[in-house]
């Protein structure tokens, strides 16, 4: 709480609306803070001795940590300290189902997380269907929704996001794919879809990049861990092809096929119909060409990888070799209205995962590369926290993404999931004094028992000035279901945050 004489501002604020309303009418309405600092008696401010005390008090509040004036309204905070700052923390795959080994509790309920619980006590909680009830989200569609974009309207495939996040400058007509380094045995059966979660893949990527085929240019790049991206560039190629990833072990990689069927009838004589059929035939021809290119590329990559010194050494150590590439998620670059243009706030992304960085980059947000951020359970969270605080100086909205909980969920590792939750909680106290609003949620559930994404809703908490608090005292899936926020969709989260920040626009007259 504010200390006297700072608390006098609450009884003397009746002088301020006159000044603020007049300042708002100026062309440079966002420069309120500069006007307060440079002008001891701002234009229109009442000529009363008490006014100077209010001004002095406002300056004292601006110099104080943000947590000390959390009881004030959002609009007043904006007036006193400048632009409102929001931090959205996304713990990838953090939500879970109850586990018998944990006395039918979830990892989030077992984890020691005093900071998340503190946010729940002073904020509003709820549960969220990132896409829709009963729909298990991919990480790509989930992050589109969490940034306020409708994935049903904007999603064109995972590949473009992976490529953009890997630093590849995509051109019109490029087709991008997500790739997994995987392990196959001598019978071409997939024994590990992630090649033992291999991390050092740069040498492998360099070898694969040397593959040349007629018909298209291949751009291959490793991203984080077992992940990579592949871009096809050239004429007459298509994203309308199937995946080679069987999405489970014990099966052979799938043959990539065109998704368009061969037309069985001859072209009709009617010009309009014939034109449509000819276009379909052309699309099908391009898809067939692309499928053949990808199958040939996969075969050549397998021959290169199984003989590579890195994999020979892994076999000697008893580790699964990264001797095959599973290709999936082909797509073209989507058109996204820039985040700042759409919502009126300047956004920044602090993440290691190429997918998340790519979504944010294509949305026009600033993307920060953090040394030590691995996109795994061993990521350097303190380095990420430092990057968040640095970017808060120049951005209104920061998205902090942490991948580790999802990885632990896919591996069925209860201990690792609890540990990463506790590590994320430990850095939250670094943000309390630098952000007005702090939001914590997950992009989807990755239950230990399923080892994959499910449609279970995820918990969300929003804490900050002016938020209607509820009776929830802890942060978990079970507790959040009783919260005042109710049950929302992923694409509703940003509009709710924007409204709390005082930047929403009225719908209607």
Question: Which residues fall in each region the model found?
Answer:
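Short, positively charged low-complexity motifs
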Residues: 1-2, 7-14, 37-39, 48, ...
């Amino acid at each position: 709480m504010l200390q006297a004489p700072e608390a006098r501002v609450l009884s003397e604020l009746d002088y301020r609306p006159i000044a603020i309303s007049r300042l708002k009418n100026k062309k440079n309405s966002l420069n309120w803070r500069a006007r307060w600092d440079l002008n001891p008696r701002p234009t229109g401010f009442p000529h009363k001795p008490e006014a100077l005390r209010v001004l002095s008090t406002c300056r004292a509040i601006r110099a104080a940590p943000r947590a000390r004036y959390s009881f004030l309204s959002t609009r007043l905070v904006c007036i006193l300290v400048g632009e409102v700052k929001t931090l959205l923390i996304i713990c990838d795959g953090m939500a879970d189902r109850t586990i018998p080994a944990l006395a039918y509790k979830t990892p989030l309920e077992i984890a020691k997380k005093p900071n998340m619980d503190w946010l729940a006590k002073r904020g509003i909680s709820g549960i969220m269907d990132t896409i829709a009830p009963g729909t298990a989200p991919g990480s790509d569609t989930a992050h589109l929704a969490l940034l306020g974009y409708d994935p049903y309207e904007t999603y064109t495939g995972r590949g473009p996001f992976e490529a953009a996040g890997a630093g590849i400058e995509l051109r019109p007509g490029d087709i991008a794919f997500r790739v997994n380094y995987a392990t196959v045995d001598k019978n071409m059966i997939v024994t590990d879809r992630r090649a033992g979660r291999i991390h050092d893949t740069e040498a492998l990527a360099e070898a694969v990049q040397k593959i040349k085929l007629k018909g298209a240019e291949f751009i291959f790049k490793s991203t984080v861990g077992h992940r990579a991206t592949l871009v096809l560039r050239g004429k007459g190629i298509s994203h309308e092809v199937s995946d080679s990833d069987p999405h489970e072990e014990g099966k052979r990689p799938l043959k990539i096929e065109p998704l368009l069927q061969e037309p069985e009838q001859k072209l009709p004589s009617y010009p309009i119909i014939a034109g449509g059929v000819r276009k379909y035939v052309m699309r099908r021809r391009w898809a067939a060409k692309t499928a053949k290119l990808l199958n040939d590329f996969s075969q050549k990559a397998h021959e290169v990888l199984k003989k590579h010194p890195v994999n020979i050494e892994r076999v000697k150590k008893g580790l699964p070799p990264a001797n095959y590439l599973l290709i999936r998620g082909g797509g073209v670059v989507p058109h996204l209205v820039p985040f700042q243009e759409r919502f009126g706030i300047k956004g920044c992304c602090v993440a290691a995962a190429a997918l998340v960085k790519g979504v944010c980059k294509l949305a026009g947000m600033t993307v920060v590369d953090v040394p030590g951020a691995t996109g795994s359970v061993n990521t350097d969270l303190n380095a990420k926290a430092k990057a968040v605080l640095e970017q808060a100086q120049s951005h209104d909205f920061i998205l902090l993404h942490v991948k580790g909980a999802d990885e632990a969920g896919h591996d069925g590792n209860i201990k690792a999931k609890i540990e990463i939750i506790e590590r994320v909680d430990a850095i939250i106290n670094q943000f309390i004094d630098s952000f007005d609003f702090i939001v914590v949620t997950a992009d989807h559930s990755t239950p230990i028992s399923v080892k994959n994404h499910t449609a279970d809703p995820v918990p969300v908490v929003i804490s900050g000035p002016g938020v209607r608090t509820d009776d929830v005292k802890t942060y978990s899936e079970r507790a959040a279901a009783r919260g005042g926020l109710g049950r929302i969709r992923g694409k509703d989260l940003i509009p709710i945050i924007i409204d709390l920040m005082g930047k929403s626009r009225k719908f209607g007259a």
